[in-house]
Each structure stands twice: as structure tokens, then as C-alpha cells.
């Protein structure tokens, strides 16, 4: 059991019989009283995010999760399949459990499988991935005055804003935490 005051973003806890990833933590302290810890927890089995308030001093159980290196191999419309890098065993994860992460997956993307009781319950992406631009408008000379960018659609269907000099067919590096363009690859 761990004190809720030590919760931080990215931790995994057991709460109400399910496993949750801590998405956000805000600590509020009142004068002459106990503090209030406001959290956003993502249920790893349903994908739903819920807000839970704890009083300081409460305890929660830390979930025992392990991480295994794996590669994304394919999807069949409902399940996304990954191959363990050590044992070459294949694991299927329902699309609903990786709703946010699927926009960054192309064949052979290296990920960490989040395992609980020997079963995969989610994935952890690398901090950036390289994706190809499949659709964007051509840039025009003089467009750089605004300093903005133009919309682009990547090979996975992800829509991002890229600088004007990026053209269709080029590969770009995208931050998986924010979904923003980093650089040309």
C-alpha cells in the first residue's frame, strides 16, 4: 500500500478492483486541515478516465505491472497484435484498450507491453515515432510570414500541423505524448 500523497503521473494502482494508470495529480492543501489529492485515473481495461479525490493519508494499492519489449506486427480491425522481442510470443490487445496509441503504430514499431498477471493490458509508446506524410497542401512562397504551419495527414491517419516546407511523401518525427511535429526524419 502506498500513500496517495506519493502518487505521481504514470504510476499504476489498483482501485475499486481495477487497474488504473495515474494520468494527472493535483495536491490541494487547506489551512488547518488535511489535504485533498485530486487525480485523473485511466482504467486500463475499459479505457475510461475518471476523476477521483482522495484525502491525504489515504492509502491505495500499487498494481504489479511488468514491461516487456515487443514489436507491433499487424491489426485485424478489432485486435492489435504484438510480438515479444525475447520469446517471439504474439499478444493481441483489443483496439479499445489502445485507442490513443494506435495513431502512432506502424509495422515493426518498438513498444513496451504493459503486463499484469501474464496478460497484456496496454502498451507504452516510445517518446517519438517516424511517420510518412500522405496528404498535405503544397507550401507557397511567402507563406512563412505567419510563422504557422499547415495541416497534414500521416500514414496512420493522424492529423497534425507541420511547417510549410514539409511535402507529401516525406517522413516526420512526431512526439507521441503531445501529437506534435518535432522535425523531418
From Swiss-Prot:
Keyword Cell wall biogenesis/degradation in annotation: no
Highest taxon of source: Bacteria
GO molecular function: translation elongation factor activity
Entry coiled-coil feature ranges: none
CDD domains the UniProt entry points to: S1_EF-P_repeat_1 (cd04470), S1_EF-P_repeat_2 (cd05794)
PANTHER family: ELONGATION FACTOR P, ELONGATION FACTOR P (EF-P) FAMILY PROTEIN
Role, per record: Involved in peptide bond synthesis. Stimulates efficient translation and peptide-bond synthesis on native or reconstituted 70S ribosomes in vitro. Probably functions indirectly by altering the affinity of the ribosome for aminoacyl-tRNA, thus increasing their reactivity as acceptors for peptidyl transferase.
Protein name according to UniProt: Elongation factor P
Provenance organism: Thermosipho melanesiensis (strain DSM 12029 / CIP 104789 / BI429)
